[in-house]
Amino acid sequence: MGCFCAVPEEFYCEVLLLDESKLTLTTQQQGIKKSTKGSVVLDHVFRHINLVEIDYFGLRYCDRSHQTYWLDPAKTLAEHKELINTGPPYTLYFGIKFYAEDPCKLKEEITRYQFFLQVKQDALQGRLPCPVNIAAQMGAYAIQAELGDHDPYKHTAGYVSEYRFVPDQKEELEEAIERIHKTLMGQAPSEAELNYLRTAKSLEMYGVDLHPVYGENKSEYFLGLTPSGVVVYKNKKQVGKYFWPRITKVHFKETQFELRVLGKDCNETSFFFEARSKTACKHLWKCSVEHHTFFRMPDTESNSLSRKLSKFGSISYKHRYSGRTALQMSRDLSIQLPRPNQNVVRSRSKTYPKRVAQTQPTGSNNINRITANTENGENEGTTKIIAPSPVKSFKKAKNENSPDPQRSKSHAPWEENGPQSGLYNSSSDRTKSPKFPCARQRNLSCGSDNDSSQLMRRRKAHNSGEDSDLKQRRRSRSRCNTSSGSESENSNREHRKKRNRTRQENDMVDSGPQWEAVLRRQKEKNQADPNNRRSRHRSRSRSPDIQAKEELWKHIQKELVDPSGLSEEQLKEIPYTKVETQGDPVRIRHSHSPRSYRQYRRSQCSDGERSVLSEVNSKTDLVPPLPVTRSSDAQGSGGSTVHQRRNGSKDSLIEEKSQLSTINPAGKPTAKTIKTIQAARLKAET
């Protein structure tokens, strides 16, 4: 009967924390199943971190379409269908859900430390823009908390470059951080972290949870949820701010989000925005309800307001914030905070190569070249240090918080394939998440940026034609692995031979001489047999054949003479050349389609014959030969062109005369006439 038993609800989850460590939750160790409530998972994480002020934090995940969600403590894991569809294993991201309006008033050091890690991550990834002077001050506090007091023997030149604080970190900023760090003697890590938060909370974008939306004419806006209210950004500028006490309704329907605000004249105004998708709109609505409840209402009104706000959504969409509000947390006297004898364990931050003088050979690709210039005849030089490529920390085994877009470390799925929009980031950085950029992907390697850059250079060095060959080699490799023993070895050997042969065939060669030889042979062949040419495509040109044109122009002299001074008798005695053309009979096929008829005629005759046959009647079947001969000069009796046609006969005669010039032996110019006769014997239809 065991086969009829229910399948055990196995659950395997990885939680990525703010200090870049990982917590694994499984059914065997913690007893977590798919029927477990989200609050149980949160409790395991809070106990691991030793947090008591837990209402500021949450767990986030994303679905297959890279839409982010917060784990609902009141629902079971199985009810989070978007999460279940992504695994197993499942990945959750720990972070701040509600930013404290004044993080310096947090009661415990461990809570402030988690806020410090989150805000430092926000500044590093561009979600918290900082002026240069503020960034230098915050970086100095972070270095003081990380390394302690400045020691000239331990902290040599360029030691600040081992850490990253802002995107596109410059050398000038690192020098300013080093100068300020020397003035922070005696500050403990907890004090330095407190000063860091005190500086960060004054920034405009502190604690802003951004959501991309669209306004009128599909113009891009950002709605930011803050402790004080909702701010609206357009083109990196704040265009509106609505405080929570003034917001009377939040509503969504499909992809439309409504924000109703009470004005100073006690009139309500509704603002409508369009979200990217229905799930994104619902997520924005949920976050708005939770922020409004957490920061706005006192403890006596929080439940009633939550029920009221839950009715603002569409039918069957109700959401209630189940946690405590900020006011409830401040008035909670059940736990005496801070707890005595609390020891906060801090982790080292991710490190990068130090900016040092160049000691590597010329061909090194890992460290950029630096130059040393001697000034005023001194022996010591001024060294210009350029930031090297970042590498993975020797201690951390996870992939997070990269300021460089081409690092080989893995990122959160909503960072890599998120919406192409952002507030303070460029178009290349707009795939970053509005929150929680740390991530893990199971099948990605964790190499350094140097390895990835070298790999990209190697890939670019190959010919573009190797793409199809690479796919073919992969298919061959997969087929080879299905066998075993000597057959597999032989197939692998053949595969290597084929790969080497393919690489040799793909080498670039100079094809200029070969191409010239082909053109030369083709030209000789065409000169030997003009009728051997076959066109493989439609030719839109109807010009005569070049060879026929050259043959015709041999009998024509192009020096024109003005006949105004010649007498009437001299004009009558103008000599001319009689030229006749001939060719092989050509079979003409009648067709209903003019295009196919023209194509058939062009494929059956040369270009020279096409010009001669342009006057042939389409109703005939055969065209007799049109020979090309040179006749002796003949005398004409007129200076004008004469056309003789015999209607109803089989032959037609066309005579044309033109005045050309010749030079007699005495050196006097005389006028000549070239008489061109086109004779065509037509076979009548029987």
From Swiss-Prot:
Residues 518-527, 547-561, 648-658 have a biased composition (Basic and acidic residues). One of its GO terms (molecular function) is cytoskeletal protein binding. Keywords: Cytoplasm, Cytoskeleton, Phosphoprotein. GO terms for cellular component: cytoplasm; cytoskeleton. Transmembrane segments: none annotated. Brain, heart, lung, liver and spleen. Not detected in thymus and kidney. It is found in: Cytoplasm, Cytoskeleton. Residues 332-669 are annotated as: Disordered. The modification Phosphoserine is found at S304, S389, S393, S402. Residues 11-299 form the FERM domain. Residues 479-489 have a biased composition (Low complexity). This is Band 4.1-like protein 4A. It comes from Mus musculus. The gene is Epb41l4a.
